[in-house]
Regions:
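Hydrophobic beta-strand core positions in alpha/beta domains
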Residues: 117-118, 195
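Residue-level marker of regulatory loop/turn positions in helix-turn-helix DNA-binding domains and
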Residues: 98, 119, 151
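Short, flexible loop segments at the rims of nucleotide/cofactor-binding pockets, characterized by
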Residues: 92-97, 121, 189-190
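Residue-level signature of catalytic and energy-coupling elements of molecular machines
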Residues: 36, 64, 120, 155, ...
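Residue-level detector of anion-binding/catalytic polar loops
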Residues: 46, 115, 192
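Asp-based, Mg2+/Mn2+-dependent phosphohydrolase catalytic module
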Residues: 2-16, 107-110, 123-231
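Ser/Thr-glycine-rich phosphate-binding loops at phosphate-binding pockets of nucleotides
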Residues: 24, 28, 120, 182
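N-terminal helical cap/lid subdomain that shapes the substrate entry/recognition surface
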Residues: 7-112
Length: 231
């Protein structure tokens, strides 16, 4: 499994896989940008690609708090998230696409009896909508949301929650991420991490990932569960 670059930790002996969602399982970063733009247009406000890049991997609630403070909006963060999420869900229903190699990887994990979870900064309603639209709910033992933890990525909270629910040690978990914040969270949790940058995150620094691949198509699960090193 040839990587673009390799980190210091050997990717080996994987006993569970934890997937980020946005940018990893689905090509959603452009839709998040459009949702912010559509919602903030109601206030005659703009939201650019640089703004979206700064929010990649962060909890929706944290993003909302930042924007409310910046623009002095008279609403709570929960109200902001709820309204922006309505726009996002409409876009997901119309335009959502699964990333290349995802179905093959999930099916292989199922065949190998590797337990899997989603650990996303997104809200639980958004995660549930995605697995419904993509018809992948049967592949995941657990769904873990940024709603359920105190600290969002780059803190490790959501990944540690996933490991606890899966019943495995953090060191036995492989995280697949696409953002700098997500990789930081995975490594802070003591987990192995493969970064697969998406179009929106290809400019980010992934030197701290254990392995960087160009696509989910390059993930070879048979090798990951072996005790030998892939790095």
């Amino acid at each position: 499994m040839a990587g673009i670059s390799a980190g210091k930790t050997a990717v080996k002996g994987v006993k569970a896989i934890v997937f980020d969602m946005d940018g990893v399982l689905i090509d959603s970063e452009p839709l998040h940008l459009l949702a912010y733009q559509k919602y903030l247009a109601n206030f005659a406000l703009t939201f650019g690609e640089d703004d979206n890049h700064n929010f990649l991997g962060m909890k929706d609630l944290d993003c909302a708090k930042h924007l409310i403070k910046r623009y002095q909006l008279e609403m709570t963060a929960l109200e902001f998230v709820g309204q922006k999420e309505k726009v996002l869900h409409e876009l997901f229903n119309e335009q959502l696409k699964v990333q290349p190699g995802v179905f093959k990887t999930l099916e292989k994990a199922h065949q190998l009896k590797l337990p899997t979870a989603i650990a996303s900064s997104a809200t639980m309603p958004t995660i549930e909508l995605v697995v419904e639209l993509t018809r992948t709910s049967h592949y995941f033992q657990y769904l873990c949301s940024g709603d359920e933890v105190q600290n969002g990525k780059p803190a490790p909270d959501v990944f540690l929650l996933a490991a606890e629910r899966l019943g495995v040690k953090p060191s036995e978990c492989l995280v697949i991420e696409d953002t700098y914040n997500g990789v930081c969270a995975a490594k802070a949790a003591g987990m192995m991490c493969i970064a697969i940058p998406c179009q929106a995150t290809k400019h980010q620094d992934f030197a701290h990932a254990d392995l960087v691949l160009a696509s989910m198509e390059e993930v070879k699960l048979e090798e990951l569960i072996q005790p030998g090193s892939l790095a």
